[in-house]
């Protein structure tokens, strides 16, 4: 869920709240990672470069800070000891973690029909801090995504609540 406040069509403070989860098993089936359904929040601001035009159209740069606390487990971890010719599997269950990250983004929104618009965002995000556990590190962070990628692209379809009855001046 995203809420944006349009301030003079130039600055747009924004809050994102959501839930994320993950399940991942590599091709060699050496383990299964399960991120439990967990909340995340992001808070930031966008600057609209088309502030002199219709508010339904935006080209913007933004910055956000995100936080999530989450649980995960890693099961069926396969190991092979070649020296002793031993192999087996074990689980790492009940792992808890949290993370803080920052994002820089560029985006575009266009009006499709009435109060419905669509757009995309490309963002660079970086972890500032995350809790590592004694036996594992989180692979997936809700709201951030996989830890091994700093770039992301999203596509959005939005509905604008008509809270203000004033019309934008026509030229």
Label the predicted regions.
Residues 26-34, 88-94, 140-145:
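Extracellular loop and loop/strand-boundary signature of outer-membrane beta-barrel proteins
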């Amino acid at each position: 869920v995203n809420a944006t406040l349009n301030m003079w069509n130039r600055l747009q403070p924004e809050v994102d709240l959501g839930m994320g989860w993950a399940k991942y098993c590599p091709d060699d089936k050496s383990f299964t990672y399960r991120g439990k359904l967990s909340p995340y929040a992001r808070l930031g601001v966008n600057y609209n470069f088309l502030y002199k035009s219709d508010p339904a159209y935006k080209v913007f740069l933004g910055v956000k800070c995100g936080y999530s606390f989450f649980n995960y487990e890693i099961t069926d971890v396969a190991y092979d000891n070649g020296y002793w010719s031993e192999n087996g599997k074990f689980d790492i269950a009940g792992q808890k973690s949290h993370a803080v990250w920052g994002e820089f983004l560029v985006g575009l929104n266009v009006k499709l029909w009435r109060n419905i618009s669509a757009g995309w965002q490309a963002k660079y995000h970086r972890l500032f801090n995350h809790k590592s556990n004694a036996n594992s590190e989180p692979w997936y962070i809700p709201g951030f995504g996989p830890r091994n990628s700093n770039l992301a692209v999203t596509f959005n379809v939005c509905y604008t609540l008509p809270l203000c009855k004033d019309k934008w001046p026509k030229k």
